[in-house]
Amino acid sequence: MSPQQEPTAQPPRRHRVVIIGSGFGGLNAAKKLKRADVDIKLIARTTHHLFQPLLYQVATGIISEGEIAPPTRVVLRKQRNVQVLLGNVTHIDLAGQCVVSELLGHTYQTPYDSLIVAAGAGQSYFGNDHFAEFAPGMKSIDDALELRGRILSAFEQAERSSDPERRAKLLTFTVVGAGPTGVEMAGQIAELAEHTLKGAFRHIDSTKARVILLDAAPAVLPPMGAKLGQRAAARLQKLGVEIQLGAMVTDVDRNGITVKDSDGTVRRIESACKVWSAGVSASRLGRDLAEQSRVELDRAGRVQVLPDLSIPGYPNVFVVGDMAAVEGVPGVAQGAIQGAKYVASTIKAELAGANPAEREPFQYFDKGSMATVSRFSAVAKIGPVEFSGFIAWLIWLVLHLAYLIGFKTKITTLLSWTVTFLSTRRGQLTITDQQAFARTRLEQLAELAAEAQGSAASAKVAS
């Protein structure tokens, strides 16, 4: 009888954690699990971690996109329990505990034991998605580069235009939404026109450009209170920004915006360059979760999670960041970071034997909110204390530097800020032809051709 071989014991499989998204929530969850006995797969649509609060500075030429978007796999390269995967998550199979993603026509299935959904949010046009073609939002590097191209291209086209009406339209910049992003964007476009580009053109005067900030609300920066909102508005007006409140946008096209004022008046603003910062809409994955579970969504599509950030019936599935609707937690970076760390700590504790039924609820610590208005001027609210002006700007600068990833990134960003804030010069004003004409390239070229034909006809008649 031949000897029987003893069966070899298979090594126990490690707990599998899948993270969807590489933003503040996804990245911080992965880093918090660095020393945990888990295998992590982080799936994201982009190859970088985006520091979204500074996107407006990419759009206005202050810093480069590389300074706020380090490659995710480079950030996590020393964390051996993480695998970074590029792909667009199309479905979460709750019953089968599997995430389905696609990349260049190929479909992949990634099983999980614990799932952290941190897919973020996109721009909301409140049911008018066709506005996006004419008024890009600011949620990605592509958005910021497109806006930079549109802003600088408007000045370039105005320099070549012989039509006063078209020139006025090109030099009118409209920002929709008077929240932090809108305030920061309007302020930087105004400074770009007033200081950086001053004297750079021969046919136009960049300082004559109009910057309009629109909002349906009755105040600027509503979440920060009336006092700080008024101070921000006063600073913007000093820069020459026209603030129009109680103004609801009803239509957007290539040539401008239609607005309905609070008194019912409907009017038109001719503006070639529009920026949309009026609202956000959570990832469609929230709807995917709702269709398979008892979880409900709010009006913005956010998942109404339980106090432990899990979803009803699935204690191993967590939602954090902009996708999660949690009372008292704003849709800002700190909410995503703190939520992600809480979930990672929960997973580690339960792997060590903690009872899932005894989870402590997530507690958010409000570290304050802030917005820059212009060089050396910002507004900030930390607890009950309010700051404005230079002190608030210093607080803003220090905190944003602290949260940037990597020593080299911090240094290069600080150098870019130093050059811009002390000299008004900006080092990132190069645009490509694709960025300049962006999504409306064919229409813009047709308009230029029509104007050229009109000028030629006029010259022929005159001769």
From Swiss-Prot:
Principal cellular location given in the protein's record: membrane
GO molecular-function terms, A-Z: NAD(P)H dehydrogenase (quinone) activity; NADH:ubiquinone reductase (non-electrogenic) activity
Residues spanning the membrane: 387-407
Subcellular location field: Cell inner membrane
EC number(s) stated in the UniProt entry for this protein: 1.6.5.9
First and last residue of the signal peptide: none
Official protein name in the record: Type II NADH:quinone oxidoreductase Ndh
Species whose genome carries this gene: Mycobacterium tuberculosis (strain ATCC 25618 / H37Rv)
Gene: ndh
